[in-house]
Structure formats: structure tokens, C-alpha cells
Curated annotation (Swiss-Prot):
It comes from Enterobacter sp. (strain 638). GO terms for cellular component: cytosol. Its EC number is 6.3.1.20. It comes from the Bacteria. This is Lipoate-protein ligase A.
């Protein structure tokens, strides 16, 4: 019986691909070695312990229809588009060893004429006249009896967009989440013009087979029909949920301040698990009552722009004479927390 399994995803949906990865990892026999090859369309993928409001330009992501996906491994935030090739290696313990999977990727790159090397704990770099340039980043996850190593290879990614979505607005935000480290990066196409996703996948697959002296047929995973993986529907629902992608953020505080023609406003939010646990309001407005009422209404609310806007708009019923000010405040809050 073969000990290898090779899966290739036809989907560009990050929630689908991460759900497939999670299901395979949970259910694989401890004696199996798995290679999963995939890629995502326009997505910011954050680490398990990260705060999306701190790491990402969430407003620009929303405007550009860029998805947010929280993975189950640690590490920092990365931007994925179809110029990235993603790989996942899985194995049971004690065989699981990220140095083996790293060596397989390095061998695959070398077979394509790219002389890369491991750098630090997570990166693969190539040496250029401008210095070391990162072409791959990785993250890892281990349980009691198994582990996985997943990462991306920058093939022909739009690096300008990477900077757009991973450089957040200068929000007055204090958080305990892990901060992503930005590094000098390079696309493999700069080093090997014409290189394709298919070539990289073929090279990784061949290096994988060669290392284990065994070959298997690839299983194509498609969104056209539900994958034959136990609990996939439930795993996908969780992976695609706001509660997982945003609500799992570490506790943080957010300060918003603005000056309107009718007065200055400071809002202090304490947020835990994506819900507001405390709101403090400071203002020099001649009529602070609507703002005080807003602070009370927001207790326990989900920290989402549309929710905060709805709560603010609802105050017009109680304070009709301040409708203009409340609409202005509502619009500002919705923009500020995105």
C-alpha cells in the first residue's frame, strides 16, 4: 500500500483550499506523507494569532474585493494572488521534519535553474547583486502525532498590491497580535523568465516522488463537487466565517478621533473575540447625550463597520434634532473601522 498522497486543487478560493488542507491534516493516517498543491486568487492570509485590523488595510481590501483568510498555523500576514504557488507537506511523527520538505522545494527550484537556499526559520532566498531576495515564506503546525509545513513561492505576484494590502492605515491601534515582518522579495519570473505555475508544481511533485522513491496519481480537488472528505462542509463553513477570520483576533484597543463642525469626538473601543467589551466617548460637543447613548448601545456589538453604522443610525429615532450630526458620525465610524 502506498504511503504517499498527492492532491492538486482546481479552486482559487482560499477558504476552500484551507478547508481541504485542514480536513486532510486531521484525517490522514500517521503513516502517510501528503503533498497538496494549490493557489489562491486575491487574498490576504493571516496567521492564527494575528489581528486583521492591525495587519491589513481592511478598507482597501473591501473596496477591491480581496478576501481575508485566517490559517491554522502561526506566523505573519501574506498577500496571495495567482502569481503565487502554494504547497503543503504533511507527515506523521516522528517522520515529520520540515527540513525534509524544505529540501524537496529547494531541489525542485534547482531543477528549474533557480539556486535558492534556506534563510532563517521560514524563508527561501536567492542571492542577487542587490543582496538576498526572498522568494518563499513558510509556516508550520504540529499536533501530538503529526505536522505540516506550508508555504508560498512568489512566481509572478503583483508586488505592488502586496504592499497595498499589508501596509495598514496609520490607525491608533494597540494590539497583542503578532506583527508581520516585511522583507525584500523577488518573483521567480525575474530570475527565470517564462517560468509557470505548472512547471513549479511539476518540479515539486517530481522532487517529492524522488525523495520517497515512490509515485502516485494526483487527486484533483474541485469546487464543482464537494470533496470526499469527512466533515468538509462544516470545516469550510468555519473557515469562511467572519467569526473565524475576524472574530479570532487577539484582544485589542482601538482609538478613533475626529473633529466635526459641531465638536470633536474620541471613541475608545476595547475588543475581544471580535466583540466590543467597552466603549468610552469623549467630546466637547454642546450636546453629548447622543454619543453617550451610542457608547451604551455598542456594548457587546460585533466589531463590524456595518453593525456600528446601524447602531449609530438607530439613534436618530431618539435624537431626531441631531439627525445630521448622527449621520455624519455614522459615516465616519463606518469608514474608520474598516
Amino acid at each position: 500500500m502506498t504511503t504517499l498522497r498527492l492532491l492538486i486543487s482546481d479552486s482559487y478560493d482560499p477558504w476552500f483550499n484551507l478547508a481541504v488542507e485542514e480536513c486532510i491534516f486531521r484525517q490522514m493516517p500517521a503513516t502517510q506523507r501528503v503533498l497538496f498543491l494549490w493557489r489562491n486568487a486575491d487574498t490576504v492570509v493571516i496567521g492564527r494569532a494575528q489581528n486583521p485590523w492591525k495587519e491589513c488595510n481592511t478598507r482597501r481590501m473591501e473596496e477591491d474585493n480581496v478576501r481575508l483568510a485566517r490559517r491554522s498555523s502561526g506566523g505573519g500576514a501574506v498577500f496571495h494572488d495567482l502569481g503565487n504557488t502554494c504547497f503543503t507537506f504533511m507527515a506523521g511523527k516522528p517522520e515529520y521534519d520540515k527540513t525534509i520538505s524544505t529540501a524537496i522545494v529547494l531541489k525542485a527550484l534547482n531543477s528549474l535553474g533557480v539556486n535558492a537556499e534556506a534563510s532563517g526559520r521560514n524563508d527561501l532566498v536567492v542571492k542577487t547583486r542587490e543582496g538576498d531576495r526572498k522568494v518563499s515564506g513558510s509556516a508550520y503546525r504540529e499536533t501530538k502525532d503529526r505536522g505540516f509545513h506550508h508555504g508560498t513561492l512568489l512566481l509572478n505576484a503583483d508586488l505592488s498590491r502586496l504592499a497595498n494590502y499589508l501596509n495598514p492605515d496609520k490607525k491608533k491601534l494597540q494590539a497583542k497580535g503578532i506583527t508581520s515582518v516585511r522583507g525584500r522579495v523577488a518573483n521567480l519570473v525575474e530570475l527565470m523568465p517564462g517560468i509557470t505555475h505548472e512547471q513549479i508544481c511539476d518540479a515539486i511533485r517530481e522532487a517529492f516522488f524522488e525523495h520517497y522513491s515512490e509515485r502516485v496519481e494526483a487527486e484533483i480537488i474541485s469546487p464543482d463537487k464537494t470533496p470526499d472528505l469527512p466533515n468538509f462542509a462544516e470545516t469550510f463553513a468555519r473557515q469562511s466565517s467572519w467569526e473565524w477570520n475576524f472574530g479570532q483576533a487577539p484582544a485589542f484597543s482601538h482609538l478613533l478621533d475626529e473633529r466635526f463642525t459641531w465638536g470633536g469626538v474620541e471613541l475608545h473601543f476595547d475588543v475581544e473575540r471580535g466583540h466590543i467589551t467597552r466603549t468610552q466617548v469623549f467630546t466637547d460637543s454642546l450636546n453629548p447625550a447622543p454619543l453617550e447613548a451610542l457608547a451604551a448601545r455598542l456594548q457587546g456589538c460585533v466589531y463590524r463597520a456595518e453593525t456600528l453604522k446601524q447602531e449609530c443610525d438607530a439613534l436618530v429615532v431618539d435624537f431626531p434634532e441631531q439627525e445630521t450630526e448622527l449621520r455624519e458620525l455614522s459615516h465616519w465610524i463606518a469608514q474608520a473601522v474598516r
